[in-house]
């Protein structure tokens, strides 16, 4: 196994990009794409072939959970980094939708659009990493959160990192007479895996420093550690034990099922950590229920309270 090669990874795990990269070995059976030794079986429903049906249920469940989290974040009107966290969650929804498209065969691997959707998926996951790092630095309050300047810096940074990864993926997948092609995937591996792993590591270290030296709240440290545990467990189940899981489950699910589930739990822990270290700055909580005003400009509750003494 050479550095940057997906040959060994794709032999064990049915990653979406495995259908658009080639084995390093020129004598491979397929001109393009690496078929894993074991992968989840497909299901035919209404003359439509659906791949990774178990993974699809996890994605739909993840979308519901993220919508609930977004509702809770929007309710914390004055919390630090509220808009930035909402942007992170919107990116997470985009990533799950793109994963549904490439995992479940909405765009078949044989179609010309498949490579573009895989590039979008990798680009969104990269943008999600840089957005998470920005949210982590925001908690140190080096700059004002929620302002137009802060949001535009976040948007431009995420779009730039998305564009870089997207372009690297497309050039690698399409082989447009460049130094990159579907057999030379070292650059793709560095951008999609190595650099994003470094970004996530910096985020985790920064949040541990924030909790230990600034907040001194060890309950929130537990949320960080749980998030790291779920993320690492998902990567291990996806890239190491996928083949064994697939064979043990009789091809019904593989490592992608458990990896996607662990990613959803990771999103939940990221939100929980943010929720624990932030609070509303209002003196009184803000309710979403509007109070009716009578013709004298007095609310119903105010009228009842004043009538007790006057």
Swiss-Prot record:
Cite the GO molecular-function annotations of the record: unfolded protein binding
The membrane spanning regions, by residue number, are: 50-70, 86-106, 114-134, 151-171, 194-214, 221-241, 257-277
Bilayer topology reads: Multi-pass membrane protein
Query: What are the recorded Gene Ontology BP terms?
Result: cell wall organization; chitin biosynthetic process; endoplasmic reticulum to Golgi vesicle-mediated transport; filamentous growth; filamentous growth of a population of unicellular organisms; flocculation; negative regulation of filamentous growth of a population of unicellular organisms; negative regulation of flocculation
The answer to whether the entry has keyword Endoplasmic reticulum is: yes
Q: Which UniProt keywords apply?
A: Cell wall biogenesis/degradation, Endoplasmic reticulum, Membrane, Protein transport, Transmembrane, Transmembrane helix, Transport
Q: Name one Pfam family in it.
A: Chs7
Q: Which family does the record claim for this protein?
A: Belongs to the CHS7 family.
**Role played:** Chaperone required for the export of the chitin synthase CHS3 from the endoplasmic reticulum.
Q: What is this protein called?
A: Chitin synthase export chaperone
Species in which this protein is naturally found: Candida albicans (strain SC5314 / ATCC MYA-2876) (Yeast)
């Amino acid at each position: 196994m050479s550095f940057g090669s997906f040959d060994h990874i794709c032999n064990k795990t049915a990653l979406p990009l495995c259908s658009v990269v080639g084995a390093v070995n020129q004598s491979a059976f397929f001109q393009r794409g690496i078929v894993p030794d074991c992968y989840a079986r497909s299901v035919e429903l209404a003359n439509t072939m659906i791949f990774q049906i178990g993974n699809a249920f996890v994605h739909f469940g993840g979308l519901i959970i993220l919508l609930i989290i977004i509702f809770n974040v929007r309710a914390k009107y004055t919390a630090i980094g509220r808009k930035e966290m909402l942007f992170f969650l919107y990116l997470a929804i985009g990533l799950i939708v793109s994963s549904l498209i490439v995992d479940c065969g909405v765009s078949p691997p044989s179609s010309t659009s498949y490579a573009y959707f895989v590039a979008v998926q990798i680009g969104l996951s990269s943008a999600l990493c840089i957005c998470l790092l920005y949210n982590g630095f925001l908690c140190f309050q080096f700059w004002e959160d929620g302002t137009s300047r802060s949001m535009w810096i976040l948007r431009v940074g995420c779009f730039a990192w998305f564009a870089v990864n997207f372009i690297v993926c497309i050039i690698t997948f399409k082989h447009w007479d460049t130094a990159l092609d579907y057999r030379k995937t070292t650059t793709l591996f560095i951008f999609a895996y190595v650099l994003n792993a470094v970004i996530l590591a910096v985020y985790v270290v920064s949040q541990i420093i924030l909790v230990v030296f600034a907040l001194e709240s060890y309950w929130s440290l537990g949320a960080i550690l749980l998030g790291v545990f779920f993320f690492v467990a998902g990567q291990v189940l996806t890239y190491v034990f996928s083949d064994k899981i697939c064979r043990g489950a009789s091809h019904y699910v593989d490592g992608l099922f458990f990896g996607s589930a662990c990613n959803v739990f990771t999103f939940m822990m990221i939100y929980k950590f943010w929720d624990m270290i932030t609070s509303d700055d209002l003196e009184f909580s803000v309710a979403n229920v509007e109070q009716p005003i009578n013709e004298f400009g007095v609310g119903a509750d105010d009228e009842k309270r004043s009538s007790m003494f006057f």
